[in-house]
């Protein structure tokens, strides 16, 4: 109602949106994206509950070649996007499992946890820990009964902050997750938005005897959110459980979309795509971050993803900033929406500790709009500062 156009359409500034560019990243040698997919008479049959064999093989080949893993197609379940896979994992957790989730995470996790009646504890995210708590905080058993299992839910690279666990830190996280009584759901939607690309599968020792769940998708790094293809990598036993659910609760995933995903994952193509995504978004992260620092914003962004995690000066708040941006066809994501400790009923009396924080997305922004995006943001921000008596 404020601007008259849907966010993301021409003339708007989709700084609140979580989608990537869906055109080739030509500046960095990104490959073309497929513009068609062949559909045969066989594709009009019902799809298999666990995913098309060709796509499962393509996913396996990608992870095994990139990360030195040894998964098989029986470790892969295909879903209609990333979030149905995450929802399914949560829906089938046993009653003695408690989730640990960061105070700041992807907003949809709270919906999923609530709708599946999952018990969860919050792990603090603060300026003091740089919005990057230690691995051990997710597995702290103080006050946890002996028969309770712990399952951290972590996006990595993290949405909204871009904080990333890689190398030895990620190895330690997976080692903890594989211990008896533990598990993990690692959401790797932004796997390619880090140098180098990062996946927990690199450090998994015994997937089939673990409760490690890795979520991936074509949505971000493969630049194709509209085809709605995602997957879960897990033990054969856990995949079998999810496939049983698919047969009665989902009915499989569109064959044409799965064929498109196979084309995206063609080995020589995906190698070029991964390199281009890394370079393009590293470049965007760096120059937007520098511009925000020059404005005097607090920048707490990690080295992954395509968001900036920013703090306004004292005396300002992100909700008021957003209202002012709306008038110009722009928006940010207020941090309160990422606050996993807020009541899901959206109790108006709840005061988030993150009122000055917000997420700025450079994911869908074209390189040539950098100057105009920063100019508009600076104008609205500076006007708000003046009105707040801060200048």
What is each model feature region?
Residues 56-58, 205-279, 286-292, 375, ...:
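Conserved core segment of the aminotransferase class I/II
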Residues 18-22, 83-84, 105-107, 128, ...:
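Short, solvent-exposed loop/turn segments at secondary-structure junctions
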Residues 22-23, 281-282, 296-329, 337:
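Conserved PLP-binding catalytic core of the aspartate aminotransferase-like
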Residues 1-50, 65, 147, 182, ...:
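N-terminal "arm"/small-domain region of PLP-dependent enzymes with the aminotransferase-like
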């Amino acid at each position: 109602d404020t601007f008259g156009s849907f966010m993301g359409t021409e003339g708007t500034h989709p700084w609140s949106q979580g989608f990537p560019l869906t055109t080739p990243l030509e500046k960095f040698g990104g490959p073309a994206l497929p513009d068609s997919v062949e559909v045969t008479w066989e594709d009009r049959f019902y799809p298999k509950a666990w995913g098309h064999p060709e796509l499962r093989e393509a996913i396996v080949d990608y992870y095994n070649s990139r990360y030195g893993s040894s998964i098989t197609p029986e470790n892969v379940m295909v879903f209609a996007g990333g979030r149905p896979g995450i929802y399914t994992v949560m829906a089938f957790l046993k009653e003695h499992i408690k989730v640990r989730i960061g105070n700041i995470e992807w907003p949809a996790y709270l919906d999923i946890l609530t709708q599946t009646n999952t018990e969860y504890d919050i792990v603090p995210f603060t300026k003091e820990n740089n919005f990057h708590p230690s691995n051990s905080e997710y597995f702290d058993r103080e006050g946890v009964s002996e028969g309770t299992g712990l399952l951290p839910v972590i996006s990595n690279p993290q949405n909204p902050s871009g904080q990333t666990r890689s190398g030895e830190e990620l190895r330690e996280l997976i080692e903890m997750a594989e211990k008896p009584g533990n598990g993990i759901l690692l959401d790797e939607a932004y796997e390619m938005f880090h140098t180098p690309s990062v996946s927990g599968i690199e450090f998994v020792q015994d997937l089939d005897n673990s409760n490690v769940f890795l979520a991936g998708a074509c949505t971000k790094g493969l630049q194709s959110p509209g085809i709605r293809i995602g997957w879960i990598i897990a033990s054969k036993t856990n995949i079998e459980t999810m496939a049983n659910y698919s047969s009665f609760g989902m009915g499989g995933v569109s064959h044409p979309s799965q064929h498109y995903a196979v084309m995206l994952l063609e080995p020589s193509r995906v190698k070029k795509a991964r390199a281009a995504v890394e370079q393009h978004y590293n470049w965007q992260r760096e120059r937007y971050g520098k511009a925000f620092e020059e404005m005097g914003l607090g920048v707490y962004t990690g080295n992954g993803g395509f968001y900036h995690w920013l703090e306004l000066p004292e005396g300002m708040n992100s909700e008021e900033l957003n209202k002012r941006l709306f008038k110009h066809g722009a928006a940010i994501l207020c941090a309160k929406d990422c606050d996993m400790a807020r009541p899901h009923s959206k109790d108006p009396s709840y005061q988030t500790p993150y009122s000055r924080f917000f997420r700025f997305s450079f994911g869908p922004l074209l390189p040539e709009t950098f100057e105009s995006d920063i100019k508009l943001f600076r104008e609205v921000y500076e006007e708000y500062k003046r009105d707040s008596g801060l200048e």
